[in-house]
UniProtKB/Swiss-Prot annotation:
Function: ATP-dependent specificity component of the Clp protease. It directs the protease to specific substrates. Can perform chaperone functions in the absence of ClpP.
Domain ClpX-type ZB: 1-54
One annotated Gene Ontology cellular component of this protein: HslUV protease complex
The keyword Magnesium is assigned to this record: no
Protein known as: ATP-dependent Clp protease ATP-binding subunit ClpX
GO MF annotations, alphabetized: ATP binding; ATP hydrolysis activity; ATP-dependent protein folding chaperone; protein dimerization activity; unfolded protein binding; zinc ion binding
Amino acid sequence: MARVKGQKVKECSFCGLSVAELGGNVVISNGVAICPECSKICHNLFKEKLCKPLDSKSNGLPTPKQLKDHLDMYVVGQEDAKKVLSVAVYNHYKRILKNNKYDNGIEIEKSNILLVGPTGSGKTLLAKTLAAEMNVPFAIADATTLTEAGYVGEDVENILLKLIHAAHGDVSLAEKGIIYIDEIDKIAKKNENVSITRDVSGEGVQQALLKIIEGTVANVPPRGGRKHPYEDTIEINTQNILFICGGAFVGLENIVKNRINKSSIGFSAIEKKNIREDTSLKYLEMEDLIKFGLIPEFVGRLPVHSYLEKLNKEDLLRILVDPQNSIVKQYYHMFKMDNVELVFEKDALESIVDEAILKNTGARGLRSILEGLLKDVMFEVPSISKAKKVVVTKESVLNADVNPLILVGNAIKKPWAKELYEINLKYDKK
């Protein structure tokens, strides 16, 4: 019979079945035992408690302002996009709580979202952060891997399978989730003219996405891949799934500016002259997206539009250190697990940002730069028992042959070490 610290455990502490009846198949800790069946029940109870925030208004649907405040903790800048997303997400889940209908029977259609902005500007992070705050399943799909049914590549239904996996197989929970489709601009039509050759990764994919984005009952192969006639499928209703599509849309700003310059309505000659290419997306219209290569029906399924600005040096410096989950804080805590403090020279932070700007990788490139910079140090530090502090210097950023300093013993008494970390948490813009 199982023992814990000399004490006999005779039965499951939850259902009362004896250890003998269970064939000894119990987990025991601190004198408490649980059988597999009770463990499964507990798991389901926890999942129900943690993953059903939308059952009633009393559960506290966050207001748009509360959602934006949460985004501010994790995402730097992009004020307009934060407001647009916060309102859209709030309205979407308010609609679900009301069962898609208002008191007089008016049916409220869902409003999917299109985000336009350069690589590394925060599109994916915004969607992911909102899903986490709403406590709903979240999945990311890459539009470039999708093809029209019957051709080599992924069927659009595989996007839904990712969401079902994120919901741990709970289809009803997945039906309230959020899907972010990245690189949506890559499925634009190759040109505006009708072609005799089939565009299976462009217009064909847009046509395939129409129904699931608008709302339909889809049949998803449980193992992914292509559907087979005699294979069992998972049925999922996409009516309440929020789709957020994002892409860089390189060249779209020129389309917008050309339209404005040709227009005789709404813009004075001075206003037209003052509209720069990098700000022209403020005036984005549906016709510009159609001109770019999205079909009208697809654009119509994405009625909420917002654009994200290209991040400047000040933005990237803040992204490094300010957000609650900033890259610098992540690495700081990673080193802290080895009882080593990570600090940065102020000039080193600026040099890291300069490199990201030079590579035109935006915020996404900051992590890869830091990973390369700290690679050798992360290899060495766990083997140095007296290591207390790692200092990232400007020279170590600029020169690949120079590693960050590893300080041991009494070397940590240098007064600037503590100040360095304060600087990297509270970066002085001046």
